Design a protein with these regions (language model features):
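Short, compositionally biased strand/turn segments
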Residues: 97-99
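Well-ordered mid-protein domain cores that form the structural environment of catalytic cofactors
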Residues: 101-103, 110-127, 131, 135-152
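Signal peptide processing junction and immediate N-terminal pro/mature segment
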Residues: 22-24
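Short secondary-structure capping/turn segments at boundaries of alpha-helices and beta-strands
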Residues: 62-65, 101-102
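Signature for the C-terminal beta-barrel architecture of outer-membrane proteins
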Residues: 26-59, 68-69, 74-75, 79, ...
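Bacterial N-terminal signal peptides
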Residues: 9-20
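N-terminal secretory signal peptides that target proteins for export/translocation
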Residues: 1-7
């Protein structure tokens, strides 16, 4: 009975909110905008590399976004078409239909932001949650559900998320089986604490908790009966500080046992740590980054791999190449099951008007990055420890 009362109260509140929003919109002009993208490819056989022409002989990807805005209210959808999808995209994408739709009400004066439908979001550096799209790579793990963002006072922001992730497309959006539930809090201490308002050092703190639910069963390994956990939790704490030309940040993330295809269905807990230190002034910039990862694969479907249904994101600490040759010669991707890595980058601009700077100035950059596997000891094959945990980590070093 109490739940029904709460639900009715929430429904009444939303109805009043929507009514107030409509009244407020009466004085605001409506705006409709959008964009269209089409990618068509024709294929020819290349015997030198063994490329075989697909039966369709062509690939076709297209999308169109339509957005409606009026005051604090916005809504939109994305119509997509894959007939057939171009090579390099998930081959299971097929047909035409709506792949993304949402409605949003955001009132900054009241400190409330409500979204239903699809949305993208990220907590901190993404170590526990990042929903994003990289259309050119065929990556889209948009959340589909409900998001509430509250700003109860200046300097404090709360996020609540509940939904499923985009997984497939067959004449329309298909979500994965797992349910994602998340909460995030971020505090700007210089705004919240009056005594810190004029301090030269600006500090922001944040904390997140993300869990997933996926039905699971038990299975036998040797003499052990192992049950798949249905509820998996992860959490993170972060800090960011800025003082004049200096910036420093750190984030730690943890995850309870999460057997999956990525880790060989072991019950080992996961950890990740990311830290950056940077300095900049006119014409000069320095950035140092360190990252440590141990078993931090986190998906809303434990049986999938590669780019399918990732909840979190572990960034690579190497330079993002501008030119394809360097990226081809030195490819790198984060090893989410375990690695220790670090990078250093220096940027310098030779002043314009100087002999080397020329008319517009000359920009120089140098970078170094290294990644190593963790220092681990694998448990003896066939032992209980090996089945459950796989290995023991001796240190974060190589």
């Amino acid at each position: 009975m109490n739940l029904n009362i709460v639900a009715r109260g929430a429904g009444l509140w939303l109805a009043m909110l929507a009514g107030g929003a409509v009244m407020a919109q009466d004085q605001s002009p409506a705006q409709v905008s959008g964009n269209v993208g089409i990618l068509w490819q024709s294929y020819a056989e290349d015997t030198l590399i063994g490329a075989v022409v697909p039966p369709s002989k062509t690939g076709y990807n297209a999308f169109a976004n339509v957005l409606y805005n009026q005051g604090d209210f916005s809504a939109g959808l994305r119509y997509e078409s894959y007939l057939n999808s171009v090579l390099g995209f998930p081959g299971r994408f097929d047909g035409s239909g709506v792949g993304y739709r949402f409605a949003r009400y955001a009132d900054r004066d009241r400190g409330i932001d409500v979204t239903i439908g699809n949305f993208y979001d990220q907590f901190g550096n993404g170590l526990v949650l990042r929903a994003y799209e990289e259309r050119n790579l065929g990556i889209d793990n948009a959340l589909d559900g409900f998001r509430l963002v509250l700003t109860p006072k200046d300097g404090l922001r709360l996020k609540f998320i509940y939904g499923k992730q985009r997984f497939d497309f067959r004449d329309g959006l298909i979500n994965g089986p797992g349910v994602v539930r998340a909460v995030d809090a971020e505090a700007d201490l210089n705004t919240l604490v009056p005594a810190w308002a004029d301090k030269p050092t600006k500090v922001t703190l944040g904390a997140s908790f993300v869990s997933k639910f996926q039905p699971g069963t038990s299975f036998n390994v040797d003499s052990l009966v192992l049950a798949m956990p249905q509820n998996i939790g992860s959490w993170s704490y972060r800090v960011n500080a800025v003082r004049k030309g200096w910036i420093a940040s750190a984030e730690y993330a943890g995850k309870i046992n999460d057997p999956s295809a990525d880790n060989g269905y072991t019950y080992r807990n996961g950890e990740a740590f990311l830290a950056t230190l940077g300095y900049s002034k006119k014409g000069l910039g320095v950035l140092l980054t360190a990252k440590m990862v141990d078993n931090m694969s986190f998906r809303s479907d434990r049986d999938l791999r590669l780019f399918d249904l990732p909840i979190n994101y572990i960034p690579a600490v190497t330079q993002q190449h501008t030119y394809n040759l360097a990226a081809t010669l030195y490819p790198y991707a984060t090893v989410i099951t375990g690695e220790t890595s670090a990078s250093a980058e220096v940027f310098y601009t030779i002043p314009k008007g100087s002999k080397l700077g020329g008319k517009y100035g000359t920009k120089l950059s140098a970078s170094f990055s290294a990644a190593n596997s963790l220092d681990t000891t694998r448990y003896a094959e066939g032992t209980r420890e090996q089945v459950l945990f796989g290995y023991e980590r001796n240190s974060w070093g190589p």
